Amino acid sequence: IYRIMKRSIWALTEQIRHGTFQPAGYEVDFMQVNELNVQNMMLDEEHKMRLVGKIDRMDTRETEDAVYVRIIDYKSGKTTFQLLNLYYGQQLQLVVYLNAAMAQLKKEYPGKEIVPAGIFYYRMDDPMVEADGEDEEKIMEHILSELRLNGLVSLEREAYEQMDVGLQGKSEVIPLTLNKDGSVSKRGTSGVAPVDF
């Protein structure tokens, strides 16, 4: 457990260093945004269901006219984000968290647009990679790539470029790959257009 925690702390720190997003909240309880209606669902005219939970980590990046937000949920198992599961309502956790975070940020930044940048799982792990005579720096790059965030990234250039500044090719941080011409590759990318978020 100690080795996995140590590796995860290193990887999470590196992921933050690669971009300009900063943690804005840890263990953000829905009760902290008690007056929000985003987690309330009307079942019928008389009954309401209230969703409760905690957002493991909420990162933001503020610009002159917008606040970008990404949600990260820590997982110890092999949970992976599947867009089809989201479509069929089987994997709603990250979307519910994003909606709650966006509602909270709208109250905190009333004059700014709140822009979803991504919803991600981070798998707590200490993966083994093949060294094949590579130097330590290359090995660490492989490990970071194995631990990259898993989820859905906004294909808005401003969003993904700020999560992995200087990105060329396959990101070690987010599920996104760029072609040589700088366009987003369909292979190695799990993303949607900003309007679809």
Protein language model regions, located:
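Structural signature of nuclease core domains in nucleic-acid processing machines
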Residues: 1-197
